[in-house]
Amino acid sequence: MENFPTEYFLNTSVRLLEYIRYRDSNYTREERIENLHYAYNKAAHHFAQPRQQQMLKVDPKRLQASLQTIVGMVVYSWAKVSKECMADLSIHYTYTLVLDDSSDDPHPAMLNYFDDLQAGREQSHPWWALVNEHFPNVLRHFGPFCSLNLIRSTMDFFEGCWIEQYNFGGFPGSDDYPQFLRRMNGLGHCVGASLWPKDLFDERKNFLEITTAVAQMENWMVWVNDLMSFYKEFDDERDQISLVKNFVTCHEITLDEALEKLTQETLHSSKQMVAVFADKDPQVMDTIECFMHGYVTWHLCDARYRLHEIYEKVKDQDTEDAKKFCKFFEQAANVGAVAPSEWAYPQVAQLANVRAKDDMKEGQKPILSSIELVE
């Protein structure tokens, strides 16, 4: 196993944060905790329901960790939407993370997908059944164009996860494969479209800006995620089908060359994102900027990405990139480092146990006769 290229990662991260002029001022600490708890509480009750517990069959600790990660992502990044929208998006994106971490073969449950869809029957695949049930709660926040993007992108995501089940990084020489798979499973259009709820934006009035934002966000969001998650995925056996690793296989280049390719594309996308919307509707630009800064804060602060390990490793180094990275990390931590104990309560498993006990008590009640009911 190669050693992690720490110096290169520091330089790349610093350039990215400088390009987007990182300065997360989306919330006060009190507002952040309030929104985190609201979104978490609604989502936790959703996943504690018996139907969700029975059909998802996810380890309770993994489900808890997934929910906390996604609530953080949504609250930090979708800073302009309502708390209710944050909660519904948190549920939707938690479903996607659960699927992303799954190793089940979807083939048997997808044999009748279109027939069931056309006939209005419940899907055989439990994930689709649950996601479809929740979709109306998500789509009620958006106009028809944004809604179509959310639906289509979610379908693409499912297909991308299906492909990943084969741990296939592409054939050498298949240069289009890495980006094809990353666009498929990146949820870029879903994310890009879900920034524009109808209570804040008229999608007909802002159609051109929204369409462009969806197009730009598709690459920016997934590439930033690939860069910021490169450290955690570097030596994780479950994460070897990443964009960078697929570049290595398909383009037949070294790991350093693949990382440089991703870096250059991410930095170019960041420049475009800032430049394209600089003179557009101020509300649109503000929404995009808040998303970008919040999305970076989430990556720097969420334990899933382990970037605190990089910080601890380099905080005493005297190089310019190390000092800049540490300054950005501390800046993010000052606004975004909120312990889950302050907002992620009660645990999903606790809520599920309470529901199970209540159901047992309900089942033990004596059945009253019709005469007793009248009396």
From Swiss-Prot:
The keyword Lyase applies. InterPro entries: Isoprenoid_synthase_dom_sf (IPR008949), TRI5_ascomyc (IPR010458), Trichodiene_synth (IPR024652). It holds the Pfam family TRI5. Keywords: Lyase. Its EC number is 4.2.3.6. GO terms for molecular function: trichodiene synthase activity. One of its GO terms (biological process) is sesquiterpenoid biosynthetic process. Pathway: Sesquiterpene biosynthesis; trichothecene biosynthesis. TS is a member of the terpene cyclase group of enzymes. It catalyzes the isomerization and cyclization of farnesyl pyro-phosphate to form trichodiene, the first cyclic intermediate in the biosynthetic pathway for trichothecenes. It serves to branch trichothecene biosynthesis from the isoprenoid pathway. Belongs to the trichodiene synthase family. Trichothecenes are sesquiterpenoid toxins that act by inhibiting protein biosynthesis. This is Trichodiene synthase. It comes from Fusarium mesoamericanum.
